[in-house]
């Protein structure tokens, strides 16, 4: 090992351990007690650091609680980069999500302990939901850049990458919300498949004549 790099590498590993300890402490305390019953000071104490150290790694307890979810967007984007170049953009996004669900090395949400409980809590707590939204937006910005690169376009001038990611990420979000409401931890893959099927198929189809007439009649009655 290069002696000049030894100290920075050690510092990096120590910083990673400290961040992980804070995130794990926040995760456990919030799921055990509830978000409103946990303070930043208690999280820092559980991780055996002080309040100032917490603030070097996280801006809020919500950010610390959700830190374990940040890597999932990166994994989906890594899978998206690896998809065949000739796949249509939305198909590539869907299959990247599928790759993330099935990857044995990096467990997706439904195979990680208590992630289901965390996402249920995020649906109930506005500040936690807002923090989760920021994580999703960061991942989606990277997804847009990847799709733009696949298409060979500038995402500032061509709307297709943003539309692709908005549609795919919207399907994933709808499935995640349905998963949190359903109370079935193992049901996530089915719900994600159902959401993408709806996006690719029935939502683009013309409704049957009877159904269309029924909708028109209902609208006339309400007005």
Per-segment meaning from a language model:
Residues 74-117:
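Hydrophobic alpha-helical connector segments
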Residues 150-196, 211:
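Hydrophobic/aromatic-rich alpha-helical bundle segments in the mid-to-C-terminal region
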Residues 1-49, 190:
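Basic, helix-initiating cap at the start of DNA-binding domains
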Residues 42-45, 54, 93:
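Append "Primarily bacterial transcriptional regulators
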Residues 18, 72, 97, 135-139, ...:
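Hydrophobic/aromatic residues within well-ordered alpha-helical segments
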Residues 119, 126-151, 159-166:
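Amphipathic alpha-helical packing segments from all-alpha helical-bundle domains
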Residues 34-35, 48, 55-66, 71:
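HTH DNA-binding helix-turn interface
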Residues 1-15, 157, 203-223:
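N-terminal intrinsically disordered/low-complexity leader segments
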């Amino acid at each position: 090992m290069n002696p000049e790099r030894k100290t920075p590498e050690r510092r990096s590993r120590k910083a990673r351990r400290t961040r992980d300890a804070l995130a794990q402490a926040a995760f456990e305390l919030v799921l055990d007690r509830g978000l409103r019953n946990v303070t930043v000071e208690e999280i820092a104490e559980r991780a055996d650091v002080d309040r100032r150290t917490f603030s070097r790694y996280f801006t809020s307890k919500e950010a610390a609680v959700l830190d374990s979810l940040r890597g999932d967007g990166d994994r989906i984007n890594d899978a998206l980069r690896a998809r065949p170049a000739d796949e249509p953009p939305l198909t590539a996004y869907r299959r990247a999500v599928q790759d993330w669900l099935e990857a044995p090395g990096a467990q997706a949400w439904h195979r990680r302990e208590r992630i289901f409980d965390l996402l249920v809590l995020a649906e109930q707590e506005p500040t936690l939901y807002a923090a989760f939204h920021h994580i999703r937006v960061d991942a989606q910005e990277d997804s847009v850049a990847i799709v733009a690169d696949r298409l060979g376009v500038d995402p500032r001038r061509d709307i297709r990458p943003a539309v692709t990611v908005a549609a795919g990420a919207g399907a994933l979000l709808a499935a995640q919300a349905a998963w949190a409401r359903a109370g079935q931890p193992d049901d996530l893959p089915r719900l994600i498949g159902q959401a993408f099927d709806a996006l690719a198929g029935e939502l683009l189809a013309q409704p049957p004549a009877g159904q269309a007439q029924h909708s028109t009649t209902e609208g006339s009655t309400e007005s």
